[in-house]
């Protein structure tokens, strides 16, 4: 028996039947041809801008950049997130609230100091309202008047000079006024004539000082 002849005959007999459609399908039995056919498709899909980003225009920002820009806005920075801005907005009113309170305390302190200074000026009529500028001018004039009185006492032979002491005394302003009253009588202006009217409550201090300061 001829093996070659029988093999050729058997092989020829095997191919005499009509081939099945699945036997020549390139998807199952042709990986090389399948890769060759699909390679242009993948290359065009990767390199084509229209296929690569169908939802975004060509040359535009990446999806992550577009999402970030939509969330924060074109000019926003990551540090200016809405939550951070709300937190800063909640803290700012509390910081501003301390400003008016501090300014109010400062104004009250200044007003109290001027009120004490007005009380130190002697013979101020009860119906007279002094502004801060007039209070400072009268206080300056009164200090000059007291220094002139002390200078006259020093010329008379008194060895002690006036010294300003910043110590609190028990008597307070009343004792200070009592100490100043003898000095005020020594520097009285000349007696007024019968035709001149003397203003009540302004004795002990030259009347022209009041006339000059209150008329300004």
Swiss-Prot record:
Q: Which SUPFAM superfamilies match?
A: HLH, helix-loop-helix DNA-binding domain (SSF47459)
Tell me the compartments it is located in: Nucleus, Nucleoplasm; Nucleus, Nucleolus
- PTM info: Phosphorylation by PLK4 disrupts the interaction with MDFIC and leads to translocation into the nucleoplasm, allowing dimerization and transcription factor activity.
State where composition is biased (Basic residues): 8-18, 92-104
Question: PTM Phosphothreonine: at which residues?
Answer: 107
Please list where the region (Disordered) is annotated: 1-20, 73-109, 165-203
The question of whether Transcription regulation is a record keyword is answered with yes
Q: What is this protein called?
A: Heart- and neural crest derivatives-expressed protein 1
Q: Which organism is it from?
A: Rattus norvegicus
Q: What gene is this protein translated from?
A: Hand1
């Amino acid at each position: 028996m001829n093996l070659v002849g029988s093999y050729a005959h058997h092989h020829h007999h095997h191919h005499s039947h009509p081939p099945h459609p699945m036997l020549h399908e390139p998807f199952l039995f042709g990986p090389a041809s399948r890769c060759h056919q699909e390679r242009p498709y993948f290359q065009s899909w990767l390199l084509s801008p229209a296929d690569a980003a169908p939802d975004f225009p060509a040359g535009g920002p990446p999806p992550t950049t577009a999402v970030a820009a939509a969330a924060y806005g074109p000019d926003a920075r990551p540090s200016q997130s809405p939550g951070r801005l709300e937190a800063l907005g909640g803290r700012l009113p509390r910081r501003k609230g301390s400003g008016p309170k501090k300014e109010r305390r400062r104004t009250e302190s200044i007003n109290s100091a001027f009120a004490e200074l007005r009380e130190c000026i002697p013979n101020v009529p009860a119906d007279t309202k002094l502004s801060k500028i007039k209070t400072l001018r009268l206080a300056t004039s009164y200090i000059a008047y007291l220094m002139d009185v002390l200078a006259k006492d020093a010329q008379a032979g008194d060895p002690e000079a006036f010294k300003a002491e910043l110590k609190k005394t028990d008597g307070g302003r009343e004792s200070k006024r009592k100490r100043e009253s003898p000095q005020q009588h020594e520097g009285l202006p000349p007696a007024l004539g019968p035709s001149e009217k003397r203003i009540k409550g302004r004795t002990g201090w030259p009347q022209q000082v009041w006339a000059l300061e209150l008329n300004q």
